[in-house]
Each structure stands twice: as structure tokens, then as C-alpha cells.
Amino acid sequence: DASVHQLSVAAVSDALPAMSARAGPLAVDLPVYSKRNPFVASILENIAIVGRGSTKDTRHIEFSLSGSGLTYTPGDALGIGASNDPAIVAELLSLLSVARDAVIDVKGQALTMDEALTHRFEVTAATPRFLDYWTLLSDAAELKQLQQDDRAGERTIFLKTHHILDIVRRYPVGAVLPTGFVTGLRPLQPRLYSIASSLAAVPDEAHVTIAPVRYALHGKSRSGVASGHLADRAELDASLPVYIQTNPHFGLPGDDVPIIMIGAGTGVAPFRAFLQEREARGAKGKSWLFFGERHFRTDFLYQTEWQAWLKDETLSRMDVAFSRDGAEKIYVQHRMKERTRDLFAWLEEGAHVYVCGDAAQLAPDVHAALIDIVAAEARSSPDAAEDYVRALQADHRYQRDVY
């Protein structure tokens, strides 16, 4: 999913049947719950935070951590164990002619196929392992040809453009053994979301900001596994397994240190946490937020909160870029270049820079803008400006949480 990190934590799935059981005695300084023993958190709030007419369905979701003993700091992430769409599982079992109550062994535990495909295995994205398995069962010449060494590029494209359901539907086979089918699947992995809250402001809660991944493939609407679950099926009071993933490389400096925060879309989530924390602590350090989205009217995430922080000076400055509101697309890096002199002055004062969001576009564009700003204001060569920015990274004054 977009706006998420993925973890290879099969152990979360292993813990699902006993999620509500506490672990044995632990050292005093360790939480009771972890990624191997996730806490079952109830959903306190799940609301859309975009306006009517938005092309997105960005949501603010609040989880209760009450009784968990879990703690986090701004910059950390929440690992969430989502489940597959029941409609996809039902269609897959129908195509396979496998009974939903057929029982299989999964790491020593007896599960029905419905349980296993819903909670334990990835049934959306096709992998090379699944393609290998299905090709062995199928008589389809097209699949056999894709396995040839000189077709590696085509095979990669095929896997990117075909889900497991697409392959099963397009290349039907005879009888499928339930135990054999799951050997071609990978474990369902939890997803990581930047925490959008501070315990200093909302004790025993963790908030996240999620934009569900939605797209069309082969004429059918598709959704991301976790983001689709959270947006479409996670109702109030529902419970999901969660854990805290610490992020020591993306955290606030001292209270008096200036901070520059740059994010687009859901990448603004940790900066909400930063400002909640600074407000609660009465921090005096200056703060500057650059925020980008598509439309001012519909997509200004957490608008009233930023305005309140500007009013009480928890947030010193804010620049916004709404890319689809004008004749030309304007992004956060363009706003940065409009504030070249002030940005460089903040850097010279010791400001820390934080970037959160898309790794493919936002991160490199902001990085290039920083180098251009330093080169222009310091009247230095591009190489010298790059050295300056590299020094910021080495001093942990330029931190990125990108995905």
C-alpha cells in the first residue's frame, strides 16, 4: 500500500489465535505486547478527513491502547494486522472448488481454509512462488513460456498486472489440494503507518492517517489489503492487532531547536504528532510546515488543527501547495524555493529538517530543492551545496521517513 511500510512479520499472524492472551513475565522496561504478541486494539474513531467531492478517501483512525502498556514517541509507527477482503476469499475458494470449512494445518494449528485465507496468507498480489506453483498445475502454454529464462522481463510485468484471482480465473486447473495451494502463498504481513498523535496529548491512544489504495485492474476495482480493510470494513469498536515500531531515525530534537517539516498527503501524519508533543511540552523552538495535496477545498488535511497551532504559535509558519488548483501544478518543493532566503537562515540557525511521504517523487524533489537553496543562498557550487546537505544528514539534522 501507498503511505505504508511493509514488514516481514509472519509472527504476527502466528499470534492471531491467541492475540488476547498476555505474554509471560517480562523485564520491567519492556512492553507486554510486541510484534510477536500484538495487542488487540479497539477502534475509537474512523472518519474521512477530506471534503465532499475529493478524489481521495483519506481517513483519520484512532486506536485505544488502554491496558496495553504500549508507549511510543512522535516519529514512531503503528504496525496493524489487517485481514483480506472476505469477498475475495469467497471468490477464490469458489474458483478453486474448495470448501470454506476444509481444515488444513498451518504451523501446527488447525484452521479452516476460510480462516487461513482471510487472516494468514496474502491472497492478492501474485508472487514468483505462486506463479511457479500454478504453472505446475496448469496446461496453459502461456504460463509455461513465461517460465523461460529469456522471458524474465515479461514475467515481472505479468506479476505486476495480475493478482492471484486473475491468474486462477484466467488459467483454470483441475482439482486443487488446499494444503498444496497455501504452499504457493506468502504470509499476510502487517503494515506500518506513521503515528499521527502524541501520548502527551492523547494518553492511551494512537492515531493514524490513511489514504486507501484504490485502482482498476482488468476492468475490476481493487483496493490495498490493509488500507482497504481500514477504510471499508474497520468499524467503530472493531478490534485489530497492533504493535509499536520504533523509529529512532525520525524524532524530535530538543524543545528549543527549530524544525522544518515537509510532507504531502498522509505524509503529514508524524508532523501532527510533533506539534501535539511540542504543544504539550510548551516547547519554544520555532516550527515551519510545508504541506502539499491536490485541492485546498477538499484535501486540506487537519486544516483547523494547523490553524489553531498557528494562532497559539506552536506552529510558527506554514506554506501550502495544492497541485490541482491552478493552471500549473505547484508542489511543496516549489514553495520551498519561494522561501529560499528564510529556509537557509533557519538551517544556519540549526534547524532540523524532516521529510515524510512518497519516496519516488517527493523525497528526491525535496532533496534537490534543498541543494538548490543552499547553492543559491551560500553562493556555492552544486557540489559544495550537496556536501552541506550531506553534512545535515550526518548530523541527524535532515531525517526522512519515506515509502
Name these PLM-found stretches.
Residues 1-403:
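FNR-like FAD-binding dehydrogenase module
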